[in-house]
Amino acid sequence: MDAQSSAKVNSRKRRKEAPGPNGATEEDGIPSKVQRCAVGLRQPAPFSDEIEVDFSKPYVRVTMEEACRGTPCERPVRVYADGIFDLFHSGHARALMQAKNLFPNTYLIVGVCSDELTHNFKGFTVMNENERYDAVQHCRYVDEVVRNAPWTLTPEFLAEHRIDFVAHDDIPYSSAGSDDVYKHIKDAGMFAPTQRTEGISTSDIITRIVRDYDVYARRNLQRGYTAKELNVSFINEKKYHLQERVDKVKKKVKDVEEKSKEFVQKVEEKSIDLIQKWEEKSREFIGSFLEMFGPEGALKHMLKEGKGRMLQAISPKQSPSSSPTHERSPSPSFRWPFSGKTSPSSSPASLSRCRAVTCDISEDEED
């Protein structure tokens, strides 16, 4: 047993130290890769009663030390593993993989118990014996399958199949009135322990199905199975159909809620965009208004220019003193209609009064 454990440790070390891509190992965080092999198993494992055995050659069991060192190719170590293998799952496959890799040269024989033995000692199975045989046959680690395997291994059975070691997990298996059906195998030094895979078993799978029975029953009714095939009563069938309709309505309501939320979100985004655009346009409008009507706006400049032109029109600038003076011709007297009085002549005093009135008007406009 010590040699076996040391061989397993060494094999694990070799796997860890094997270089991966770019010389990296598993310790570097990069899993090592193996070469792709196109050669694989093309046929299922044969049954034991279909294999010709040469009983003329004597059968001599190998020891644990010899098995760990390695045996010749023509004499592999014959390891036997048995079980029910109902609803064949990854836990079964891993157990058989461990049994296959116990020794460098291993021939794995797997025994599958019949329906009669299983129903008597363990309970009812989901799959019948033929389905369980077929499932084990197609496991890649299996070299031979024994149908109708015994519940307790006898010396005659071990000798008939020339078994060197029996592989199973080390947990005592109490059944058939015995605390451990593998106790005599352990005492004989023929027991090779394997590790049970936690979190997966046939009982766990059945528990999941029973826990969610209504879900799976409704699912199969939708897929065309009848209530009779599912062993479902008439009332439960109608209940499942009603639940299915309710679930569809709930789904539609949920879809509508999600779509309405998306619509509201889009409206909020659009409203935010509109508000931002409105603020920008308002700023532009206010800026344009101030440019036109503000204290320094264009309108004030226009009024100033108009006022200046009006002042120039009312009181034109006098010509410089250097220029020759021109005498004005006396303006003709204006006669008011229906009166014999003439219009008063423009005097310097009247011109000064007119200028004073114009200045007052301009000051009022500036205020």
UniProtKB/Swiss-Prot annotation:
Brain and liver (at protein level). Also found in heart, kidney, spleen, lung, skeletal muscle, ovary and testis. The modification Phosphoserine is found at residues 233, 315, 319, 321-323, 329, 331, 333, 343, 345-347, 350, 352, 362. Coiled coil: none annotated. Signal peptide: none annotated. Interconverts between an inactive cytosolic form and an active membrane-bound form. Activation involves disruption of an inhibitory interaction between helices at the base of the active site and the autoinhibitory (AI) region. Sequence repeats lie at residues 319-324, 329-333, 343-348. One of its GO terms (biological process) is phosphatidylcholine biosynthetic process. Residues 319-348 are annotated as: 3 X repeats. It is a peripheral membrane protein. CTP binds at residues 84-85, 92, 122, 168-169, 173, 195-197, 200. Disruption phenotype: Early embryonic lethality: zygotes do not form blastocysts, do not develop past 3.5 days post coitum (dpc), and fail to implant. Mice with a conditional deletion in B-cells show defects in B-cell proliferation and class switch recombination. The modification N-acetylmethionine is found at residue 1. Pathway: Phospholipid metabolism; phosphatidylcholine biosynthesis; phosphatidylcholine from phosphocholine: step 1/2. Residues 330-352 have a biased composition (Low complexity). One of its GO terms (molecular function) is calmodulin binding. It is found in: Cytoplasm, Cytosol; Membrane; Endoplasmic reticulum membrane; Nucleus. Keywords: Acetylation, Cytoplasm, Endoplasmic reticulum, Lipid biosynthesis, Lipid metabolism, Membrane, Nucleotidyltransferase, Nucleus, Phospholipid biosynthesis, Phospholipid metabolism, Phosphoprotein, Repeat, Transferase, Ubl conjugation. This is Choline-phosphate cytidylyltransferase A. It comes from Mus musculus. The gene is Pcyt1a.
